[in-house]
Swiss-Prot record:
Source organism: Leptospira biflexa serovar Patoc (strain Patoc 1 / ATCC 23582 / Paris)
Name of this protein: NADH-quinone oxidoreductase subunit H
Keyword tags: Cell inner membrane, Cell membrane, Membrane, NAD, Quinone, Translocase, Transmembrane, Transmembrane helix, Ubiquinone
Keyword Iron listed: no
Top enzyme category: translocase
Annotated catalysed reactions: a quinone + NADH + 5 H(+)(in) = a quinol + NAD(+) + 4 H(+)(out)
UniProt keyword annotation of Protein biosynthesis present: no
Amino acid sequence: MDWALILAWGIKILSLFFVILTGVAYYTLAERKFAGFIQDRPGPNRAGPFGIFQPLADGIKFIAKEEIFPKNVSKGMYLLAPTISMTCAIMAWAVIPFGGTLPAPEWLTTLTGVATIDLQIANPDSGVLYMLAISSLSVYGIMIAGWSSNNKYSLLGGVRSTAQMISYELPMGLSIVAIVIMTGSLKLTDISDSQKDMWNILSPPGFVAFFIYVTAMFAETNRLPFDLAEAESELVVGFHTEYGAFKFALFFLAEYMNMITMSCLTTLLFFGGYNVPFQLGAGSEYQAFIGLGFFILKVLFFAFLFIWVRWTLPRFRYDQLMKLGWKKMIPWGLFVVMFASIYTVYWKEGWMKLFI
């Protein structure tokens, strides 16, 4: 029985890994296509019909390129940096619930004895804390990359990115704390299930927390208008200036993986997660499939938002970035935590009725 469970978990993990890599590959293609649309050009259209094999061609190119190591680099740390970034990006997916419970296929039930499949690898009681911890650890990969490359542009990019991510983790954490106060749980499934009747963004504290969270989300993923770590006009390509071939591909994959992860987290925290509007399909055997479909649609919207903002807004100056984080975002984050506390007491206990 134990071996059967291990096999079932292995199949689930490998399936998720395949879906993640495929999704990230075609997310890069979608961004290049949208960039072409914005710039009035067709975008990638040579590798297969409509360019659908472009991600495969890019993958072969990265793998086939020669691995070059700059002189005087700390080789062990130099190789460790992209590994840390990629590992953290993958580990974050372990606690994301993509839907409810699906009936297992007959062949899987026969093979392992498992009758149902939870659309989540693990469901710890502190799923939100796990996500925040993993996002904090990813800073090490960027800082080590900047330091170990023995390049001034890389080092400046690493220092910038570290300061930026630490600065914006605080308001992001405060906005998430507001949601935790309102829902009363750190489990992502509980937070999603608590929004069956009303999404968190429709509540006054949730509405304010959403805008704080989304702003911090762009800074955390080093995307425009907050891509100060990779400012091409200033730092070549920032902390991965000295990286090429497969090592650069790991950083590239980690960045796009983090964008999709943040889109999933936004959906779970503010937009009901996998819950279906108006309880469509409630009680049917297809409810989990319907929930998964709605979850994917919500995630695709926020994934598109990353692309849209990149080709719409200009880059901040570094001093403006720091000023926004410490003088605006953190005070607003503290305010929304207090606001959520007062709102939750009123909503659950009705104490404010005493004063009306």
